[in-house]
Structure formats: structure tokens, C-alpha cells
Amino acid sequence: MRPLNDPGQYDDLADLWWQPRGRFAMLQWIAAARARLVPAPARDGALLLDLACGGGLLAPHITGYRHVGLDLSATALPQARAHGVVPVRGDVLHLPFADEVADVVVAGEVLEHVREPLDLLAEACRVLRPGGTLVLDTIANTRWGRFSAVTVGERIPAGPPKRLHDPALFVDRCALVAAAARCGVHLTLSGLRPSAVDYLAWLAGRRTTVRMLTTSSTAGLFQAHGRKEPT
């Protein structure tokens, strides 16, 4: 049996990153929702750093940015490159970028996979320019988060493979907000869930994608975004 939170699963399933009915389908839907929080570029040559970019699922929804994606997976990065992302292999806890270089930093579906999520957050804020935007999505450390993401989420079509998550790593929302504030970023949180109507249509083969809807509850899957205070 695989250990929980085994990153090797991403390599084993590398051919599924862009499959509309594969195990990463929901990641595609979440990426589209993530892009809604990315502002239009404010300057020519604006840089968007996409941390744990995987196969580059954010790329179709982003225009006008120099899109650089960082990931540890050697199998995912070529797919990101094929979709227009400049790939960098590296560790999200030790970013190989200078301070204050990025106009936008995105960290989607990765905080719940590291043991030091606040260190990842600090690194993301370090490379973000004053006035730049930070965009996150992750899973809350709650009973609902564990039930929806693991008990149900890892067993339904479009959900991730079993044992991909370790619920012990799910994110404390209050600690996340407080840590971001110490870095000069005041986060706004909102929940996300799939449209039930779209999901049923997707199951029936009548849709190729599912809209992710914003909710007031952040007890499960949630987004966070904020602007770094100018210095």
C-alpha cells in the first residue's frame, strides 16, 4: 500500500493531467476557478509564478503574463512547457527566485501536501512584488475538509486517487491568514464546490468540464487571495 501523500502518484498518472475524464479532472476545474482571482497584468512583461504547477493546468486561463511554473515532478513539467509555461524544476519551500520579482504568485492545491505550509507561504510572499497579488487554494483542516476531500473526494469520478492526501497536513485557516498578514498580505477567503448540475451532466457525458462555484463556507476546499502591501 502506498504511503499517504505520496508525490510519486503524480508521476504514475502523468498522462492524465489534461484528460477531461481522468483522475485530475477536478484539478482542471479548480485551475479555471483559480484563474478568476488573477488580475489583468498591470505592466508589460508582468511575471506570474505558478508554484507546484503540475502539468500547467492554469495556462489556458491566463493571458498577458510571462508564466513561469515550478514543480518537483520531471514528468509534469514537459506538459506544462507544451502549454506555454516556462518550466523550472524546484522545491516550493526553497524557491530559486530573487526577492520581489513576481507580479502574481499562485500556489494551487499544494499547501495541503507540505509539512511546513507557512514556510511555503513565506516564500511565496518573499518573491511577490509590493502591490502584487497572491492566489491560493487548498483544503481546510476540518471534519468537513477531511470528509469531502478524502472520504468522498478520493472515491468519486474526477476526484484524486486514493491516499493522495494526508488529512494531518490540511490547513489551519486562521494560522494561514495570520501568517500572511505578517508578510504584508491580507487574505480574503471563500469556499469552492463543484456545480451539482454540471457534475451530473459531466457524469452523463453531456459536459467536458464542471464549473466551480464560490461558497460562503471555507470549511472544505477554499480559495484565498490578497495584495501585498506596498513598501
Model-derived regions, located:
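A C-terminal cap/extension of S-adenosyl-L-methionine-dependent methyltransferases
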Residues: 174, 178, 182, 186-231
